[in-house]
């Protein structure tokens, strides 16, 4: 008696969830960090941009924040949770989940010839968590160049290890009009966080997510080379923003 041959058709390969783009020392303090790009997101503000996460590779991000070792990836940012600041990122959610996935080995190391096509025709967010300037500039530049556009922000313009080439890749975060003017004189395009009702400078544009309801993926002005942007402070810790201005000055 003959029997039907069982199907040997393989199930289609699942798309990769993300990639390890860099693993090495932080530019800011030399501690071990990792950059992971994830290919899908539930972030309704940004839309479906590739998200890059800059994390300590050896410490859970929640713990790193508690003990101040997030300085490797957030530098001297006054808004760090460790500084009792107003950072909007819920570290225990997405950053923690990405770190746990990294520890489980679910993200392959990025190889250009094998994986660049995943980024083709995509827009990329540099630093969904963590500061791009913690990463060697050439690495971040190459990540940005994989896609058709990028956004990015750095709070490290005053850090002793800051690479000035980031002025061409990221908005420089400013907490006051005086800071914004200072960085603009250095050649930066700024992203200023402000309180509701604050006045815009003549050379600033209100974030179009606030004024028009646009997603970042449809705007893309925060690419370091287009406009000076201002946005109303947001997030669950936004009530801490005003007190930080006293420390920042002006």
Positions of PLM-derived features:
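Class I S-adenosyl-L-methionine
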Residues: 1-250
């Amino acid at each position: 008696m003959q029997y039907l041959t069982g199907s040997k058709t393989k199930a289609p390969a699942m798309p990769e969830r993300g990639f390890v783009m860099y693993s090495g020392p932080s530019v800011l303090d030399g501690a071990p960090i990792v950059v992971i790009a994830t290919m899908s997101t539930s972030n309704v503000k940004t839309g479906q941009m590739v998200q890059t996460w800059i994390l300590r590779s050896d410490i859970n991000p929640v713990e790193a924040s508690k003990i101040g070792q997030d300085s490797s990836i957030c530098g001297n940012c006054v808004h760090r949770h460790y500084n009792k600041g107003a950072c909007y990122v819920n570290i225990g959610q997405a950053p923690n989940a990405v770190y746990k996935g990294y520890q489980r080995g679910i993200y392959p190391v990025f190889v250009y010839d094998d994986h660049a096509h995943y980024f083709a025709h995509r827009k990329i967010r540099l630093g969904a968590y963590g500061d791009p300037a913690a990463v060697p500039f050439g690495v971040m530049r190459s990540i940005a160049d994989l896609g058709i556009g990028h956004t990015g922000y750095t709070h490290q313009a005053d850090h002793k290890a800051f690479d000035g080439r980031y002025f061409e890749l990221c908005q420089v975060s400013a907490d006051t009009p005086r800071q914004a003017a200072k960085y603009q004189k250095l050649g930066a395009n700024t992203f200023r966080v402000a309180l509701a009702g604050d006045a815009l400078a003549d050379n600033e544009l209100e974030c179009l997510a606030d004024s028009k309801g646009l997603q970042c993926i449809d705007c893309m002005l925060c690419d370091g080379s287009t406009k000076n942007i201002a946005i109303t402070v947001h997030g669950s810790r936004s009530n801490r923003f005003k007190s930080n201005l006293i420390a920042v000055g002006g």
